[in-house]
Amino acid sequence: MTAWADHRPPPGVVGRAVEHEQVSGLLSGFPLVTLTGAAGVGKSVLARAVLAEHTARHGGTVLRVGCWDGLSGGGPAEALLRAAGQADTTCRDSARPLARQTAEPGIGPTLPGRAGRTGTPAASPPAGGTALAALAAYCRRQRATVLLDDCDPVRAECARLVRRLLRADPSLRIVVTARGPLGLAEERVVELAPLAVTLGEGIAGPAVELLATRTGTAAPELLVAVCQALEGSPLAIALAAHQLDRMSLPQLAAQVDSDGPLFYAGPAATVRHTSLHAAQAAGYALCSPTDRRVWARLSVLPGDFDPWLAGCVCAGSDVPAAAVDGALERLRTVSVVERVREAGGVHEDTGAALPPRYRLPRAARDFGRAQLREAGEESAALRRFRQACAALAAEAQIAWQGPNQQVAVRLVEDEQANLDAALTRPPQDAEDALGALEIAVSLWFHWAACGFRREGRAHLDRLLLLCREDTALRARALWLAGYLAAQEQSPAAAQALLDEAWTAAVLHADTDGLARIAHAHAVRELYGGDTAAAVSCLEEATRHQARDPWFGPGPAHSWALLAIALAPLDGERARAAAGRAWETRHSDGDFWLYSTVLYARALTESAHGKPTAALRACHKALEAKKLIGDPLFIAGVRHTLAELRRTVRKGPAAPDAGEETPWWQRGGTGVRARPFFSRLRAGS
């Protein structure tokens, strides 16, 4: 016999075979097993399924108490005695004192004190001990397993009750479900993650299987899209499936991706599970005021984040900066925030210690955003977010020009979602637009050197329309937009932008800017096939002494590009230019410059009959460039490398018609047909 407090049969479980086996194994060897996880992840469903199987195999009963919705006075202790169905007078009379012994001060029934004040009733150890003994005896006779379900609103009270029960009977088995652990030494915690949407390329995961039980297996790509938008949350999937009564699956996929499932509603056994909003609101009500503010302000962060970024966004007059880290950990403990990277890790490239990183799941983020908007704080939080991203971009720019460019690349990759949001969210005013433009300009190396040219141009073209005031920042943005246009072989657009940038640089007496403009013109002329004009522009750029080495390609890069331009024409001058490039470097960790210099040497040696030396230089250039990216350059080097290997093995190949076409136009091995594509996002 299984005594469920709500008398419902245990439900079926989808996609929890591993967790089911894990909980079953722990239940056989440990007295206390706690299932934790975010709201709606399926903790109660799995616990009931495991206990149903456990009692079917081993006999016995299950005493379930729904701590969130099933308590009607007296707390979990009295509810547990009621679930046991005790008719014994001693048990009934001692239930209330036991409840008082395990209750938080001020939670249980209050008694009047002097001057009309209220106080907690005095504990009654003898009666409490009697009730515990009676309950323990009942559990031994019936071989009962206790299930304290949804303990969050009375978690401390449940922890004291569990501790007393295990002291009374160490052989007792107790299963707890809550958004956070009880924190007892005897406790073994199983944390439930959302269901996987896919298990590999083309393989649907359990989240899709769960949705397909309602929709059928038609249009699997739409099922995957819906489950990805819902982040694999079982409750969100169930509520979304209920919407199919009033809309088609394609409509559901479009709506859930744009609007989110926060206010989807459907039938449920508890009020908390009738919508994601209700589920999140229940947890929000249990948080302290500080934790609520931090939760709401974190909702402006679209991606994962570290404590520094969280502090920038959340700290204010009502939330001290020192309090943010503690709030993050408390929110993580109750499964509002996910920790996606533990603290204490080591950067694989630099060996530097890595901070933890967190993530706010979509349901919690949508709920927090609604609370932020209701409190009238959304505008201020968004402004703080963009300012923090501007600081991140500036830090990345300095790291790029410093001793290790990989640090800059990793920083931008880690903060990709946040930087993208800071660049694309509509600015609130002119000052906010300048902040977004500053981010785009600071990330010049990401666009120009790491292969994201198309994205960079799109951001700059849009933001330049919003920032019309003639400032030094706008002058840099104009140069960068023209430089990217030249790299993408858009000569007309590049010419117009660089002309405007030249006027602004003259107005601001920016000699560094004039040198960068000459460098960009050289790129334009090289891709246009006018080597003489490119050499002239690069010679002008190399005569300049940079005053600001922290922005843009400096004289060293102009020397390296000059070596590439001269490689097929004048070997001695090309070698000299490559040497000057490395001599005038700003940092030994400039892999962008190093790979360009090596590639120039490879082209020079190849053009002047030294294929073996060219092969060595080309291979080193490829390895250096791989450290920072840029697929077009990498593809070009690989193409050159393949030709050099063929030459070394078999001698020079007979020329063909295609040899007259530059590699960036015809494409090397594995390159798309269109020129200067942008690097694909990881996992896309």
Q: Could you say what each language-model-derived stretch is?
A:
Residues 99, 124, 201-208, 212-213, ...:
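A eukaryote-biased feature capturing mid-to-C-terminal, repeat/solenoid-rich segments of large proteins
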Residues 294-298, 365, 386, 392-396, ...:
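Short, well-ordered secondary-structure microsegments
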Residues 44-51, 162, 280-383, 387, ...:
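C-terminal boundary/linker of central alpha/beta nucleotide-binding cores
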Residues 24-29, 40, 49-60, 100-101, ...:
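A conserved switch/coupling segment of P-loop NTPase cores
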Residues 1-25:
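Conserved adenine-nucleotide phosphate-binding loops and their immediately adjacent elements
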Residues 3, 199-200, 215, 219-223, ...:
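Loop-to-helix "switch" segment enriched in basic
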Residues 4, 16-18, 45-46, 75-82, ...:
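Alpha-helical sensor/transducer elements of the RecA-like P-loop NTPase core
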Residues 437-450, 475-490, 513-530, 553-569, ...:
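Tandem amphipathic alpha-helical repeat scaffolds
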